[in-house]
Amino acid sequence: MNPAEWIEGYRRAWEERDPEAAAALFTEDASYRSSPFREPPNLGHEGVVAYWTGATSSQEDVQVEMGEPLVDGNHAAVEWWTRMRNEGEEITLVGCLLLRFAPDGRCEDLREYWNFESGLLPPHEGWGSWRRR
C-alpha cells in the first residue's frame, strides 16, 4: 500500500464510519494522536477502533475531501476537508494528518491537527494542493 492508497482508505473508512476499516490501516502497535493535547494517544488497533467508534457515532452524511499529499520517504502530510452533520448540526472540520508508515504501508504514527466551523463550507481556492502555480 502506498501513501495515496492509504489516504483513500482513510477517507473511505471515515465516510462509511467504519472503525474496523480504519484500524486495518494501522500497525498493531500504532500511535494515533487525534489532537496534540490528547494524552495518552490512542494505541494499536483497539485504540483506533475505540476512538473511531466514539468519534463517528454521532456523525451523519460525512463527505471527506483529501488534498494532494506531500510524501518524503516513509512520511506524508495531507490536508483534509470534511462536511457532515454531527448530532444534527451541520459542521465543517478542516485538518491535516502527519503520517509515518511502516515498510508494509500501514501507518505506525498519526498526528492530527484540525479546526471546527459551523455550517457546510466549501474548500477555498487552492486548498489541498501544494503545487507551485
PLM feature spans:
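Short, low-complexity N-terminal intrinsically disordered segments enriched in polar/charged residues
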Residues: 1-28, 128-133
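A beta-strand edge to alpha-helix "cap/lid" segment located at domain peripheries
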Residues: 2, 53-133
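A structural signal for well-ordered alpha-helical scaffolds and beta->alpha junctions
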Residues: 3, 7, 45-48, 92
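Hydrophobic alpha-helical core bundles mediating ligand binding, dimerization, or RNAP-core interactions
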Residues: 7-10, 14, 26, 48, ...
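Hydrophobic pocket/interface hotspot
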Residues: 10, 22-23, 30, 44, ...
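A solvent-exposed, acidic/Ser-Thr-rich amphipathic alpha-helical stretch
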Residues: 16, 20-73
